[in-house]
């Protein structure tokens, strides 16, 4: 059968490698200077080294399969159409969730992903706004590096979305490093040095102020904007990974594998 010319956008290593192994010509576009996307960032917190090993193994596999990798390339609809691909796999991932909260766009507030990537450097005393898995892993990393860390979370339990075994280890690390936990905290307003929040149990307003840095880690939302533009150009598009829904890495990898087998 005819070799299909496929294009994987924004670092979907698994789909690219498997598709190429199955005989397709694959171009992998990545806007960043390195492959790995959010998986690479996820490997930075304590105990997540095996994720980096997995990313490296997929990079090697893609290279051996003959995937053409183009780094530092912003995927624009017109440029993609000019390459005349038979299929396009869009894996643009997820972007930080920015809720309509007063002050959330304050320039002084750091993004969690930027902290993990080494693009932003928090001060000594840090407030993490958001205590899900990502926020807690950032808190754990900063605490191990010697920062004084406080985590404010809307839910009653921090890291409620983590696997139980991993959460237990995280809580032990929090206790060891003196990480302060503020649960049931619905953030109402951001300041450069902290937040105002409502206790969801009592309805009372409180402030957490006086921090050197505030790090935003309130979750992610699927980034599917590119696929919509490509579809309007009449290009066959498949959306995978966090571009469909922000979720666990294992789920995104399984989806990428299943798609690569079908194409």
Each language-model region and where it sits:
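A Rossmann-like FAD-binding core segment of flavoenzymes
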Residues: 52-98, 104-124, 144-229
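Glycine-rich Rossmann-fold phosphate-binding loop(s) that bind the pyrophosphate
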Residues: 10-11, 130-132, 219
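Residues that mark the start of a beta-strand
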Residues: 3, 25, 124-125, 148, ...
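Short, small-residue-biased leader/transition segments that mark boundaries at the very start
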Residues: 2-9
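A conserved FAD-binding loop/helix module that cradles the flavin
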Residues: 136-138, 157-166, 238-263
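Short glycine/serine/threonine-rich phosphate/pyrophosphate-binding segments
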Residues: 12-15, 109, 135-138
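Gly/Ala-rich phosphate-binding loop of Rossmann-like dinucleotide-binding domains
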Residues: 16-21, 139-144, 231
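Glycine-rich FAD pyrophosphate-binding loop
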Residues: 22-38, 147-159
């Amino acid at each position: 059968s005819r070799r299909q010319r496929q294009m994987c956008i924004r670092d979907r290593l698994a789909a690219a490698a498997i598709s190429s192994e199955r005989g397709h010509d694959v171009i992998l576009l990545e806007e960043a200077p390195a492959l790995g996307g959010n998986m690479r960032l996820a490997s930075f917190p304590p105990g997540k080294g095996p994720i980096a090993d997995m990313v490296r193994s997929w990079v090697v596999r893609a290279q051996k399969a003959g995937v053409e990798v183009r780094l530092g390339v912003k995927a624009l609809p017109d440029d993609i159409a000019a390459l005349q691909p038979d299929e396009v796999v869009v894996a643009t991932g997820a972007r930080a969730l920015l809720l309509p909260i007063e002050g959330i766009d304050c320039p002084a507030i750091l993004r969690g992903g930027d902290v993990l990537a080494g693009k932003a450097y928090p001060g000594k005393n840090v407030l993490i706004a958001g205590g899900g898995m990502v926020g807690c892993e950032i808190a754990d990393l900063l605490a191990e590096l010697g920062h004084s860390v406080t985590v404010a979370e809307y839910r009653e339990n921090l890291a409620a979305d983590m696997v139980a075994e991993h959460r237990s280890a995280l809580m032990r690390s929090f206790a060891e490093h003196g990480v302060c936990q503020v649960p049931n905290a619905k953030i109402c307003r951001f300041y450069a040095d902290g937040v105002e929040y409502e206790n969801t149990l009592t309805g009372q307003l409180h402030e957490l102020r006086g921090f050197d840095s505030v790090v935003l880690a309130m979750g992610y939302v699927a980034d599917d904007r590119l696929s919509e533009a490509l579809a309007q150009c009449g290009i066959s598009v498949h959306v995978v990974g966090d571009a469909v829904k922000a979720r666990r890495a294992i789920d995104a990898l399984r989806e990428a594998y299943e798609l690569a087998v079908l194409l």
